[in-house]
Amino acid sequence: MRVIYRGDLDGIVSAAILMEVGLCDELVQAHPKDMQAGKVDVQEGDIICNLPYHSNCGMWFDHHSSVIDSSAMPEEFTGLVEVAPSAAGLVFKYFLPDHPELSKYEQLVKETDLVDSADLTLDQVKNPEGTFLLGFLTDPRTGMGYQQDLNISNFQWVSSLVELLTKYSVEE
């Protein structure tokens, strides 16, 4: 199954959880504006995380209040959409009851909540470590995307993080 996700920490952690439960065999990064403009090829059954809804999707997870208050909010869908600190937290909440092995992501999800909701201390911003540093590096507005002289593209690096997070902790 394809997972269409935003290439920030929230989207990456959401996709990693979906990969962990066996629902992800292909990753597609997308930007919200491209989703809204219809530029993303959403196929029947795709799982969408942290991005606007598309009628072809099989599951949808989002936490933005603008989506919930929108007329584009579908009446019925599979997944979870509610105002929350992160979409990763919603994916975690949705699958944890049937997949207790996901408990290994609990701390990562809590820290992703803090990063995505910008609920950080001054020290976490000025001296980021662990998940907070990863959040900064993966943020398209502040991170590695601005570096043009790297051996790997930002797109490739972000995509590799999804699988790496299923195998290693952030510190590893």
Regions found by a protein language model. Give the residues of each.
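Acidic catalytic cores of enzymes that act on phosphate-bearing nucleotides/polynucleotides
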Residues: 122-172
